[in-house]
């Protein structure tokens, strides 16, 4: 689950992570009133959407007067902002964050993530702040420093100081930076986050260390422990298909391809998408049906996939362990009939009751193309979509 920058900064502020003062506004008039509450002569007017790259896309403005705050607010509110993370359709700006300006000395990047290789939380930092960390990793990976954190001990003060020295935080600000990082780690752990990222973190002319950005992703599996976090969810910022999928215990992420995928298991889903790409196709989604799919669940999965107008074919790749292939086959047949599917459909089944499942598909009389392996299925759906 994602939240807006201003919500992230409210969490930071409440847990001892230093941020500039700021207020959220929903109209140009409110933006001016909120700016008046700030003790500043310079204001930063920030578009609030669930996507990065806002600055480069024109979604962050520096205002040197209240009249400029009003001008920028009118310019941004209602505008569709297109960044490298929104896709070409962009996102409409419905709220702004009005923040105090500060005398930036230097910008940095810091982030806490879960490293799947070590199964531990990792602190990453770089003195190349203000730019995409992926770009830094690709061009100058030597400028990224990491600290792997022992889950029993947590982030140690010496690790925080070492990172601060490595990214060339001014000596007079190292202790403040270390304290900042320790507080930020506490946010990550206490709120069950999957990512906490600040880009940029800045040092100021006064020697302060501040978060000028706040990106927080929460582990959906832990949200039951954080009702206060759930209340921050902005459904208008989320894909309606993803919201619908979550209602049926389906994991769905929209992509920009044209081949819909329904798979059970996240690992198999990713392997399926990679295989489709290998044979020249483009997946339209990640959809994990989980290990307990029912006929109804399969039908809903088809409806969600077909809710994407770009989909030109569907590949179902199921390994029946807990999930029985005959149940999946019955669900596929029922779904195809209910949604009146006219697009190419390739189904690969393997595992428990696989022969019975294949017989159900064959006897249905529907235009369902079988596949014996994942590779064969991927090749078939790519070919059918290209010929359609």
Swiss-Prot record:
Could you name the domain of life of the organism this protein comes from? Bacteria
Q: How is the cofactor bound?
A: Binds 1 Mg(2+) ion per subunit.
* Family classification: Belongs to the succinate/malate CoA ligase beta subunit family.
Q: Which gene encodes it?
A: sucC
Give the binding site residues for Mg(2+).
199, 213
The protein's name is: Succinate--CoA ligase [ADP-forming] subunit beta
| Record keyword Ligase present | yes
Q: How does it assemble?
A: Heterotetramer of two alpha and two beta subunits.
The job of this chain, per UniProt, is described as: Succinyl-CoA synthetase functions in the citric acid cycle (TCA), coupling the hydrolysis of succinyl-CoA to the synthesis of either ATP or GTP and thus represents the only step of substrate-level phosphorylation in the TCA. The beta subunit provides nucleotide specificity of the enzyme and binds the substrate succinate, while the binding sites for coenzyme A and phosphate are found in the alpha subunit.
What is catalyzed by this enzyme?
succinate + ATP + CoA = succinyl-CoA + ADP + phosphate; GTP + succinate + CoA = succinyl-CoA + GDP + phosphate
- Annotated metabolic or biological route of this protein: Carbohydrate metabolism; tricarboxylic acid cycle; succinate from succinyl-CoA (ligase route): step 1/1
Q: Which GO terms describe its cellular component?
A: cytosol; succinate-CoA ligase complex
Q: What is the lineage of its organism?
A: Bacteria, Bacillati, Bacillota, Bacilli, Bacillales
Q: Which cofactor does it need?
A: Mg(2+)
> What organism is recorded for this protein?
Staphylococcus aureus (strain NCTC 8325 / PS 47)
Q: Where does ATP bind?
A: 46, 53-55, 99, 102, 107
- Domain named ATP-grasp: which ranges? 9-244
Q: Which UniProt keywords apply?
A: ATP-binding, Ligase, Magnesium, Metal-binding, Nucleotide-binding, Tricarboxylic acid cycle
Which GO biological-process labels does this protein carry? succinyl-CoA metabolic process; tricarboxylic acid cycle
* Top-level class of the enzyme under EC nomenclature: ligase
């Amino acid at each position: 689950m994602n939240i807006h920058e201003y919500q992230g900064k409210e969490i930071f502020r409440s847990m001892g992570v230093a941020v500039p003062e700021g207020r959220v506004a929903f109209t140009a008039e409110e933006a001016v009133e909120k700016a008046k509450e700030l003790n500043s002569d310079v204001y930063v007017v920030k578009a609030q959407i669930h996507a990065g790259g806002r600055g480069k896309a024109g979604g962050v403005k520096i205002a040197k007067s209240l009249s400029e705050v009003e001008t920028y607010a009118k310019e941004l509110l209602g505008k569709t902002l297109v960044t490298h993370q929104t896709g070409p359709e962009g996102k409409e700006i419905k709220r702004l964050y009005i923040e105090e300006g500060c005398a930036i000395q230097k910008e940095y990047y810091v982030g806490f993530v879960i490293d799947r290789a070590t199964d531990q939380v990792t602190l990453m930092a770089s003195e190349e702040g203000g730019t995409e960390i992926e770009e830094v990793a690709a061009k100058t990976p030597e400028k990224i420093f990491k600290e792997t954190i022992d889950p029993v001990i947590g982030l140690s003060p010496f690790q925080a100081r070492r990172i601060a020295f490595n990214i060339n935080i001014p000596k007079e600000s190292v202790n403040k930076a270390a304290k900042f990082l320790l507080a930020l780690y506490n946010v990550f752990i206490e709120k069950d986050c999957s990512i906490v990222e600040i880009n940029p973190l800045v040092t100021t002319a006064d020697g302060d260390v501040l978060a000028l950005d706040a990106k927080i992703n929460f582990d959906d599996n832990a949200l039951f422990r954080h009702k206060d976090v759930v209340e921050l969810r902005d459904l208008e910022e989320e894909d309606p298909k993803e919201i619908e999928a979550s209602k049926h215990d389906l994991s769905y992420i929209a992509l920009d391809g044209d081949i819909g995928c329904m798979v059970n298991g996240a690992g198999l889903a990713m392997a399926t998408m990679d295989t489709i790409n290998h044979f020249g196709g483009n997946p339209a989604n990640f959809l994990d049906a989980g290990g307990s799919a029912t006929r109804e669940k399969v039908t809903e999965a088809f409806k969600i996939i077909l809710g994407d107008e770009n989909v030109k074919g569907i590949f179902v790749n199921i390994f029946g362990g807990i999930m029985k292939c005959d149940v999946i086959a019955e669900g596929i047949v029922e779904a195809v009939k209910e949604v009146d599917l006219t697009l190419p459909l390739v189904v690969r089944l393997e595992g428990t009751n696989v022969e019975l499942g294949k017989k159900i598909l064959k006897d249905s009389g529907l235009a369902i193309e079988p596949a014996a392996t994942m590779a064969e299925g991927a090749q078939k759906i790519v070919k059918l979509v290209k010929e359609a």
